[in-house]
């Protein structure tokens, strides 16, 4: 089977990590609260460099994000992006169902989905995973990447 798990080991890690449950919740939360509060996703709003320098940085993460980072740190670097992609896909399906029930498909759905991937793309960086900085999810990224 194709999909994000061309590396069988990563599929196993994804299952062991309970499909990155905290990351899924985090992605879902970020995508749904569009435009409110700090988004933790976009480079310009969140200066990673300061965070690296500043030992207090990581403590300011919301607990859910911290849990998600812990999940990612347990993955092998090789599997971080594939497992995140798996998590993003799962969230995308949840969102599609949720918005479908509310009759909100179309542009709004696209917007939310692009936020899921945008958030996921930067998670390794937000979580200070040394070997991975940004996951190359190109497919659903609108505009120039």
From Swiss-Prot:
What UniProt keywords are attached to this protein's entry?
Answer: Allergen, Disulfide bond, Seed storage protein, Storage protein
Result of altering residue 6 to G = In 1.0101, 1.0104/SIN1, 1.0106/SIN3 and 1.0108/SIN5
Impact upon substituting residue 130 to P: In 1.0101, 1.0105/SIN2, 1.0106/SIN3, 1.0107/SIN4 and 1.0108/SIN5
The UniProt record lists the keyword Ribonucleoprotein: no
Q: Which residues form the propeptide?
A: 40-54
GO terms assigned for molecular function = nutrient reservoir activity
Family assignment? Belongs to the 2S seed storage albumins family.
User: Under what name is this protein listed?
Assistant: Allergen Sin a 1
Organism phylogeny: Eukaryota, Viridiplantae, Streptophyta, Embryophyta, Tracheophyta
């Amino acid at each position: 089977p194709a999909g994000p798990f061309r590396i069988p080991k990563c599929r196993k890690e994804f299952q062991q990590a309970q499909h990155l449950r905290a990351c899924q919740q985090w992605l879902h939360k970020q995508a749904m609260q569009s435009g409110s509060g700090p988004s933790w996703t976009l480079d310009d709003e969140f200066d990673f460099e300061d965070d690296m320098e500043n030992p207090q940085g990581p403590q300011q993460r919301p607990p859910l994000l911290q849990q998600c980072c812990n999940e990612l740190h347990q993955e092998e670097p090789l599997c971080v992006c594939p497992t995140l992609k798996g998590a993003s896909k799962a969230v995308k399906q949840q969102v599609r169902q949720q918005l479908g029930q509310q009759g909100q498909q179309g542009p709004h759905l696209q917007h939310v989905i692009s936020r899921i991937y945008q958030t996921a793309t930067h998670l390794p960086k937000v979580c200070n995973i040394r070997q991975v900085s940004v996951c190359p999810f190109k497919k659903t990224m609108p505009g120039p990447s």
